[in-house]
Amino acid sequence: MDGNQLRDARLQNDLTQVDAALALGVTQAYWSMLEKGYRPLSERFVRKALRVLHLSPTVLPLPSEEKGTPASPQKRDFSGELGALGYPGFAYLRVKAKRNPAEVLLDALNQPDLDARVAEGLPWLALNYVAMDWTWLVRNAKVHDRQNRLGFTVSLANEVAEGKSDSDRARKLRQCLEDLEPSRLAREDTFCHDSMTKVEKAWMREHRSPAAAHWNLLTDMKGEQLAYALK
């Protein structure tokens, strides 16, 4: 989030600098410096602005260019993180602090194995947070050789968007697919199900969708079968 986004959010809420500063617990002079880019926006401030100004979690900070995002093999509560971001399948788990959807998506795609219900929620992130930082996400997916998993995720999201005649979202998702296509990997992978047996892999090769085959993934997931595609 930068000063321009902060100003736009204030105006969208029909607030003066004085009103916004009071709501966020800072002075009007300090608020003015934030909008002009003279002062950095701390994560704590952005999280408070997220609540007060009703902002999208896509404004939350992402790991720096230098730091990148690790493969994060440790156990993660992705169901809770999806629920915090509004995913209907885990709506009852909205108790965690929100994280940037792009970071949640990348970290989830880096997992060797995910609960099937969590995996089904990943295209929902791409669909519902289409304004996320795709440049950051695509770049980091390539760093970790996860562009095929990301490409398949976006393909499913695009299927859902087109099925709902949501041309604006579909256009943005197709642009992401175009950015990923040149770096598509030839090696075979799973959609976060590396523990799949040889028998299961053989079955998947015969029954996967054209999109899964295009992205060289062994999975039977299809956009039309996702619960949120039917609503």
Give the location of each predicted region.
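Short basic helix-loop element that most often maps to the first helix and adjoining turn
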Residues: 4-23
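Helix-turn-helix DNA-binding elements, focusing on the entry/boundary residues of the two helices
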Residues: 6, 17, 28, 43-46
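Charge-dense, extended regions
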Residues: 167-231
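Recognition helix of helix-turn-helix/homeodomain-like DNA-binding domains
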Residues: 24-40, 62-67
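DNA major-groove recognition helix of helix-turn-helix/homeodomain DNA-binding modules
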Residues: 42-59
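Helix-turn-helix/homeodomain-like alpha-helical modules used for DNA recognition
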Residues: 68-131
